């Protein structure tokens, strides 16, 4: 639960900047929170296939946003990945 409280703190920091809600970082943080909640839900309900599909869709959206951010600003990408404690995307 320590991770969840950490992410809510990051989310509150970014919510204070009302004009920043459309930023890539804010969207990635909110998608990460949704992913964590869905993952914990799916640990209890293994056969909830609709939630599995929703999780895959959110993962794809976050992956596309992170790819965009890594192309546009590599430093912000590295900082965000470090804050959220997620793996760097694979490159081909």
From Swiss-Prot:
It is found in: Plastid, Chloroplast. Signal peptide: none annotated. The keyword Ribosomal protein applies. The keyword Aminoacyl-tRNA synthetase does not apply. Keywords: Chloroplast, Plastid, Ribonucleoprotein, Ribosomal protein. SMART domains: Ribosomal_S15 (SM01387). GO terms for biological process: translation. Pfam families: Ribosomal_S15 (PF00312). One of its GO terms (molecular function) is structural constituent of ribosome. GO terms for cellular component: chloroplast; ribonucleoprotein complex; ribosome. Belongs to the universal ribosomal protein uS15 family. Part of the 30S ribosomal subunit. HAMAP family: Ribosomal_uS15_B (MF_01343_B). This is Small ribosomal subunit protein uS15c. It comes from Guizotia abyssinica. The lineage of its organism: Eukaryota, Viridiplantae, Streptophyta, Embryophyta, Tracheophyta.
């Amino acid at each position: 639960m320590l991770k969840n409280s950490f992410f809510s703190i990051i989310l509150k920091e970014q919510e204070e900047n009302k004009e920043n809600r459309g930023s890539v970082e804010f969207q990635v943080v909110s998608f990460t929170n949704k992913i964590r909640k869905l993952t914990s839900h799916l640990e209890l309900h293994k056969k909830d296939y609709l939630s599995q599909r929703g999780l895959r869709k959110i993962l794809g959206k976050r992956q596309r946003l992170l790819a965009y951010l890594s192309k546009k600003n590599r430093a912000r990408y590295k900082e965000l990945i470090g804050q959220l404690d997620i793996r760097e995307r694979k490159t081909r």
